[in-house]
Amino acid sequence: MAKRIYNFNAGPAVLPLPVLEEMQREMLDFHGSGMSILEVSHRSKWFEDVLDEAIVRIKRLLKLDDTYQVLFLQGGASLQFCMVPMNLALPGKPVSYVETDMWSTKAIQEARIQGKEVEVAASSGDREFTYIPGQVKVRPDSAYLHITSNNTIRGTQWHSFPDTGNIPLVSDMSSDIFSRVFDPKPFGLIYAGAQKNAGPAGVTLVIVREDMLKRVPKELPTMLKYTTFSEKKSMFNTPPCFAIYTVSLVTKWLEETVGGIARMEEQNRRKGETLYRYLDSQDYYRGTAEPDSRSLMNVTFRLPDAALDKFVKEATAAGLGGLKGHRSVGGCRASLYNATPLEGVEALVDFMKEFVRKNG
């Protein structure tokens, strides 16, 4: 087998090696079935057990009580931009959003397309989305407040969530779910495309509080209602079985190998601090996010434009992949998701030092 690289892609992203190895072992014969997990029926006991285990582990890891349901949908976070206002808006009430990057802007646009009254409670667009707003003013009659907990393009992250009182929080946690401890109680709904911290592309986690399900209008199309999936345990139609199986293995790894979310957060802080400490110690590379808003998941930085292509090319040749920034902003981005090892971050820092020595 070719040597595995250190994968800093923003998503689809690195998966834990023990998970990949377990998938490899089970690929041709899943639990004595004589079939691959790719072949078993979603109505079989084999897949039922996979689904049940994934739900139990997610609830245990995030400390979700019985008022929350865990659903597995398709369509990515982009479909949730549409489904959230469609399902959770209330007649005569505005829906509130905090705008912190391109993805939250897209969520706002989807709500407006539906004719919802959208209130932008705060925005960091005045400084190119390089920070998380400190003041969030939510109208007291808002149906919900939507935030993007981590912003992959600009490399910013909420380090404490806004206090909204009785107004439910809704969050896109696609890029930092399972990465740190947080209190789920203020959240009416959390959604996350799996392909960064939870599994492969193809499945979207939706964690919804049961009182929010009472808002879902009956006249919505069947496949666009959260209640369709809550009532059928995510199996109204054929679910993305292999992706859910992978999520189950990732959550098993988080529990049994890492030791839970608190331990995962400790590891993520060490990784982030290692790279940020180096960025702050020199002036060739320049971090783009304001220090108090820096993301532990996506570290964004720039270097002289003339050197960018050379940096990315040489890094790739050195086994450091996926460092090119998002096409909308350029620069570089190192995504340090849960499965990224500390030694990978240390190897990146060593490469950056050597690149400066040769080119600075």
Swiss-Prot record:
Pathway: Amino-acid biosynthesis; L-serine biosynthesis; L-serine from 3-phospho-D-glycerate: step 2/3; Cofactor biosynthesis; pyridoxine 5'-phosphate biosynthesis; pyridoxine 5'-phosphate from D-erythrose 4-phosphate: step 3/5. Binds 1 pyridoxal phosphate per subunit. GO terms for molecular function: O-phospho-L-serine:2-oxoglutarate aminotransferase activity; pyridoxal phosphate binding. One of its GO terms (cellular component) is cytoplasm. Pyridoxal 5'-phosphate binds at residues 77-78, 103, 152, 172, 195, 237-238. The modification N6-(pyridoxal phosphate)lysine is found at residue 196. Catalyzes the reversible conversion of 3-phosphohydroxypyruvate to phosphoserine and of 3-hydroxy-2-oxo-4-phosphonooxybutanoate to phosphohydroxythreonine. NCBIfam families: PRK05355.1, serC_1. Homodimer. This is Phosphoserine aminotransferase. It comes from Syntrophobacter fumaroxidans (strain DSM 10017 / MPOB). The gene is serC.
